[in-house]
């Protein structure tokens, strides 16, 4: 059954005014010159510390984001679960930033999300991207099987420690953990690491899950899925 064949069901969580606002927003997004101008103006306003956050929050942000933190997301999470039994996954979106302090901060945020989700029936999973725990170029170099320098080896050990700590807490809190697949030219490094972690943490039940980029036809066969868990 395709629920979107019945718009009354598909959009039951939205009021008429919310649907009208969403329609207007998508019409605006289709206008590329308007998007370019709006992006430039918004970036300027934020850098100039102009009071535009309320406007952003009431338009683009609230349509595409649940909130600025876990607690801020709760009204949307509860509404979707209570009215439609729709579960939520909190996705910490800080892509593109690199640095050991940033990676540690991201790890702590994921740990907090796991603990937060363990108390909420409406949040059945936690998720993170490998590039949130380590440099993209490092994954890429390992995927290409290039030799690492001493500093890079130490850096990779820190990446593995972050993965391991998060997986351990996911097991402790009984929260399934999805590791979001990324670009093919860095994914093998993440796959190999995850296969080891799945062997460690999925002994009694599946807690750690690798994911696939479905546009990659070479990933579709079960034999090509790294770390398959067998009950």
Model-derived features: positions:
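Short, surface-exposed recognition loops or helix-turn segments adjacent to catalytic cores
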Residues: 176-184, 209-214
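Alpha/beta catalytic barrel-like cores
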Residues: 1-177, 188, 192, 196-202, ...
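Aromatic-lined glycan-binding groove of carbohydrate-active enzymes
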Residues: 224-231
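Short, conserved secondary-structure transition motifs
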Residues: 212-222
């Amino acid at each position: 059954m395709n629920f979107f064949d019945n718009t009354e069901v598909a959009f039951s969580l939205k009021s008429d005014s919310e649907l009208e606002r969403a329609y207007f927003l998508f019409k605006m997004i289709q206008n590329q010159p308007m998007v370019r101008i709006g992006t430039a103006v918004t970036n300027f306003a934020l850098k100039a510390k102009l009071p535009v956050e309320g406007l952003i929050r009431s338009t683009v942000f609230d349509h595409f984001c649940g909130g600025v933190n876990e607690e801020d997301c709760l009204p949307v999470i509860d509404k979707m679960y209570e009215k439609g039994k729709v579960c939520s996954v909190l996705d910490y979106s800080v892509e593109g930033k690199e640095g050991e302090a940033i990676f540690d901060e991201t790890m702590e945020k994921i740990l907090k999300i796991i603990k937060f989700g363990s108390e909420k029936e409406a949040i059945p999973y936690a998720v993170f991207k490998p590039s949130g725990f380590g440099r993209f170029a490092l994954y890429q170099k390992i995927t290409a099987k290039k030799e690492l320098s001493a500093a890079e080896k130490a850096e990779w050990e820190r990446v593995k420690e972050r993965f391991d700590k998060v997986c351990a807490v996911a097991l402790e809190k009984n929260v399934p953990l999805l590791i979001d697949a990324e670009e093919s030219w860095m994914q093998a490094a993440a796959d190999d690491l995850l296969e080891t972690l799945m062997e460690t943490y999925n002994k009694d039940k599946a807690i750690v899950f690798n994911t696939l980029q479905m546009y990659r036809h070479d990933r579709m066969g079960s034999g090509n899925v790294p770390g398959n868990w067998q009950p």
